[in-house]
């Protein structure tokens, strides 16, 4: 991974560009070709993007910067991935949203249900093939990865675990947690990551289920909902979760060490789509172009989500990702991961939860 050394100044930059463009417009001959900002101003808005809560993934700053650059209003939306899919289905006859954002598995669902349409924004050629739909109906905008979030204060003199097998050691009895895979998408990603790291594949979840059985015997905690506060407060000293949640806690001064397991992790991509029959389709396209821009990618990185494109970010943010990130973090066939999920969860229910 290349590390670029430029401060994150996207909001200031785009605002300045917009201001300069406005000043230039006052002195430009009427016959001159309109600027990109002027062209954007002719696009009818607003753009409604489902699942863009202000405090998540730095969406608040991204939406604000997009409006500053284009003049197109872009209100935030509080839905999560599942709620977004449900709303798109309910509104299919008269769509309300123009774009939608969700975990990659939901991208497959949206495509399969005919809820989205093809659009390939500027910069999509830099998105890895495994992280975009071949027909252009969704593409990744950034990703997280599975990691061990370790509260080092609560760990005391115990060594920090670095592999999946380490977590099954009796010295960590009752100290490890991960979200219930039958209830949470991140939990299923944890199980899949462990399975792949321990020699399994998407056709064989045996190693992952054996690991889960050992974890159960070692007193693992399986919350149903987000448990970041539990590791922050020391209730769960070692939480297996999304890396960006840990980096955020560390940046806030909490005693959290983020460990990418030496034997392998798993990518957690987040993708976007243009909604089928979007009421403000051109505004939606402009927004999708923007989320892959250097400015937006750098803004997403402020929440410790790894940009999907190789862009310049604050060096203090870039340095939290290990140099061997790309080799540690597996990118499986997410379509197959979705297809086998029901059967794997049935086995987990029977063999682990019993």
Where are these predicted regions, by residue range?
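C-terminal motif of bacterial Sec signal peptides marking the signal peptidase cleavage site
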Residues: 18-22
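Short, low-complexity, disordered segments immediately C-terminal to signal peptides
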Residues: 23-43
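Short, polar/charged alpha-helical segment
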Residues: 38-44, 48, 52-73
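Extracytoplasmic ligand-binding site segments that recognize negatively charged/polar headgroups
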Residues: 48-60, 79-83, 95-235
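A ligand-binding cleft/hinge motif common to bilobed small-molecule-binding domains
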Residues: 105-111, 232, 237-255
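Periplasmic-binding protein-like
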Residues: 144, 174-183, 209-214, 220, 252-276, 290-313, ...
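A bilobed periplasmic-binding-protein/Venus flytrap-type ligand-binding module shared by bacterial periplasmic
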Residues: 147-154, 192-197, 268-281, 291, ...
């Amino acid at each position: 991974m290349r590390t670029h050394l430029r401060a994150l100044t996207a909001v200031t930059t785009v605002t300045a560009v917009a201001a300069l463009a406005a000043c230039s417009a006052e002195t430009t001959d009427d016959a001159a070709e309109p600027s990109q900002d002027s062209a954007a101003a002719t696009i009818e808005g607003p753009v409604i993007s489902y699942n863009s809560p202000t405090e998540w993934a730095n969406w608040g700053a991204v939406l604000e910067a997009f409006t500053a650059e284009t003049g197109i209003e872009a209100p935030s939306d509080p839905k999560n991935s599942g709620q977004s899919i449900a709303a798109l289905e309910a509104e299919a006859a008269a769509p309300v949203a123009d774009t939608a954002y969700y975990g990659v598995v939901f991208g497959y669902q949206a495509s399969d249900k005919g809820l989205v349409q093809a659009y390939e924004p500027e910069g999509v050629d830099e998105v890895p093939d495994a992280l975009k739909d071949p027909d252009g109906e969704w593409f990744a905008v950034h990703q997280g990865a599975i990691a061990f979030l370790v509260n080092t204060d609560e760990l005391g003199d115990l060594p920090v675990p670095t592999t999946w097998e380490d977590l099954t050691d009796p010295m960590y009895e009752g100290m490890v947690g991960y979200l219930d895979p039958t209830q949470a998408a991140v939990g299923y990603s944890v199980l899949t990551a462990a399975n792949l790291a321990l020699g399994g594949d998407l056709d064989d979840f045996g190693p992952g289920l054996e690991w889960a059985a050992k974890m159960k015997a070692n007193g693992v905690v399986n919350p149903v909902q987000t448990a970041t506060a539990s590791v922050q407060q020391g209730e769960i000293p070692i939480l297996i979760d999304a890396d960006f949640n840990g980096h955020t806690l560390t940046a806030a001064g909490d005693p959290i060490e983020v460990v990418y397991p030496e034997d392998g992790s798993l990518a957690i991509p987040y993708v976007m789509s243009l909604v089928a029959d979007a009421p403000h389709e051109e505004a939606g396209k402009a927004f999708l172009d923007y989320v892959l821009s250097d400015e937006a990618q750098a803004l997403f990185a402020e929440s410790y989500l790894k940009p999907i494109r190789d862009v310049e970010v604050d060096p203090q943010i870039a340095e939290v990702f290990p140099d061997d990130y790309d080799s540690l973090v597996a990118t499986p066939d997410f379509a197959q991961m979705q297809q086998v999920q029901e059967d794997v969860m049935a086995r987990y229910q029977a063999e682990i939860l019993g």
